[in-house]
Design a protein with these regions (language model features):
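Intrinsically disordered, low-complexity segments enriched in serine/proline and basic residues
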Residues: 5, 11-15
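Non-cysteine beta-strand/loop elements that form the S-adenosyl-L-methionine
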Residues: 89, 141-150, 213-222, 280-283
Length: 377
């Protein structure tokens, strides 16, 4: 009960602080955006791959970095559904890249472009070193996480707590920009408890802009850093699209991508009247077939929309290769469970790919049986 009372106070504070939104000087300079098609070959990227300069990725529609979800297998599946969506890795900490198995964290197949690496860290030198590694792996963008509210990352000065240290974030961005030629972007909240006024948000964005960042993905909620789980921080603080919209008005020269609570392509089209791009998180994972019409509705593609059964059929060779290399089918199929969402047999589909697949001597046969449930759809 004490937590609920404290949260209510924080939310009221947010509303009060943001009721009157001051304006900052406007700058009408715009930055061009390009749509880039992914490569079609299936080579696996490693740090032995030379840097491959690419046009800046288009951020009109992207899938958010999500821990335990947007791994390389998930991204391969999502790329089958949409050629133009910008995909993000899970957040990878600087310590993991510099002192762990770098290739395990960063390798991917070349079909996944356009692809961005999200980094977690707050040491400018370490972030610069990791950005160089990302460039060697031919990532199209490096993104700094300034939005994750979990206690675990806060203890290492990672994530949303950095909104309380805009000068440090600016130093981190500058160090990365000085180290690489690929774009460096930031994903952040509209504030944190104790630093949730619009003036403070503008101060944060302004300082990071001066460090050279030109693209900001804004999760339109504050983060409450004590007493709430990451899941609660995605739901309890209210969405404030108006604050993000004001930010775009006051910083027209910056690319502002909206994140938070977006569930349909109709929502996307509406928000694109105000913002430069939209980013979907949980909805894109739980209902992945939503991506199947992104290219047509948001990028003007005239290619036919892929069916659910076609997507699963195209995923089969990837799964077979992964299994042949010693992996398990569940590494891949766990990301496909939402493909039958809304159809009769959806529960059976999920059971076959999450339970039955472990019991059968030929798991690919179970995959083929599951495919019959969505055949022609």
């Amino acid at each position: 009960m004490a937590i609920v009372v404290r949260v209510d106070v924080e939310v009221v504070s947010l509303t009060t602080n943001l009721e009157k939104i001051p304006k900052t000087p406007e700058n009408t300079r715009k930055h061009p955006k390009m749509v880039k098609n992914p490569q079609t070959k299936m080579s696996l990227k490693t740090d032995l791959t030379p840097a491959n300069p690419r046009p800046e990725p288009c951020r009109r529609f992207s899938v958010a970095p999500m821990m335990d979800w947007t791994d390389r297998h998930c991204r391969h599946f999502l790329r089958l559904l949409s050629r133009h969506t910008l995909l993000y890795t899970e957040m990878v900490t600087t310590g993991a890249l510099l002192h762990g198995d770098t290739d395990r964290f960063l390798r991917y197949d070349d079909t996944q472009h356009p692809l961005a690496l999200q980094l977690g860290g707050s040491n400018p030198a370490d972030l610069a070193a990791c950005a160089k590694i990302a460039e060697r792996y031919a990532y199209d963008e490096v993104n700094l996480n300034v939005g994750c509210p979990s206690d675990r990352v806060q203890n290492n000065m990672i994530g949303a707590c950095l909104m309380g240290h805009p000068a440090l974030v600016a130093d981190c961005v500058k160090a990365m920009r000085d180290a690489v030629s690929i774009p460096v972007t930031v994903k952040h909240r509209i504030g944190i408890n104790g630093r949730d006024s619009y003036a403070q948000l503008c101060d944060f964005v302004g300082q990071v802009r001066e460090a050279g960042c030109r693209s900001f993905t804004v999760h339109a909620r504050i983060a409450i850093l004590e007493g709430l789980s990451p899941k609660e921080n995605r739901d309890i603080p209210p969405l404030r699209y108006d604050v993000a919209a004001q930010l775009k008005k006051d910083f027209p020269e910056l690319e502002i991508v909206l994140n938070g609570g977006i569930k349909t392509l109709a929502d996307c089209q509406a928000h694109l009247q105000t913002f430069d791009g939209v980013m979907l998180g949980r909805e894109a994972y739980h209902n992945p077939y939503l991506l199947a019409e992104v290219d047509q509705q948001l990028f003007g593609s005239t290619a036919p929309v892929i069916t659910r059964s076609e997507a699963l059929e195209q995923l089969r060779p990837y799964i077979a290769r992964h299994v042949a290399e010693g992996g398990t089918m569940h590494h891949v199929t766990r990301h496909v469970l939402g493909l039958a969402l809304g159809f009769p047999g959806a529960r059976k589909f999920r059971q076959m790919l999450s339970v039955d697949i472990h019991k059968h001597p030929d798991p690919l046969q179970v995959l083929d049986q599951a495919a019959l449930i969505i055949e022609g759809r």
